[in-house]
C-alpha cells in the first residue's frame, strides 16, 4: 500500500468516523470528553491534601523536659503521690513534662504502654504552666486507663498543682 492510496481527509458522510450511528449515545453532546476519573485522590494531589490535615490531639502536643538540670531542679519541687504515680512540679513559663517509667514496671512494651497512657492523661487535663515530673510505680502496669487517670488527678491535687 502506498501513501497515495490512504485518504488524508475524513469522508464526508456527516458521521463521526469512530462510532457508527447505531452505537452512538444520543444524549451525549458532541465533542464531550470522558468524565474525570473518580476516587479519593485527584491525579496531582498528595494524600495529605486530599484527606485533610490530621486533627490535633485533645490537649495539644506536650513539651518534654530536657536535660539533667531540669530533672535535678524538680527535686526541690512540690510533690504529690498516688497509688500508681508520684508527681513533682515547679512553676515555669511553659508546661513541660517528664515521664519516668523504670524497668521495674515491665518490659519495653509494657513501659511504653504506661507512658502513652500517662501522656494522654496529661494532654486531657488542662494543666497550668509548670515543669512537671510524673514517675510511674511498678503497680501502674496493672492499672487500666480510668484508674490511672483518677490516680494522676489525685496526685496532682495532693501536690497543689490542680484543685
Curated annotation (Swiss-Prot):
Transmembrane segments: none annotated. Gene3D superfamilies: 3.30.230.10. Coiled coil: none annotated. Pfam families: Ribonuclease_P (PF00825). Its EC number is 3.1.26.5. Belongs to the RnpA family. Consists of a catalytic RNA component (M1 or rnpB) and a protein subunit. RNaseP catalyzes the removal of the 5'-leader sequence from pre-tRNA to produce the mature 5'-terminus. It can also cleave other RNA substrates such as 4.5S RNA. The protein component plays an auxiliary but essential role in vivo by binding to the 5'-leader sequence and broadening the substrate specificity of the ribozyme. This is Ribonuclease P protein component.
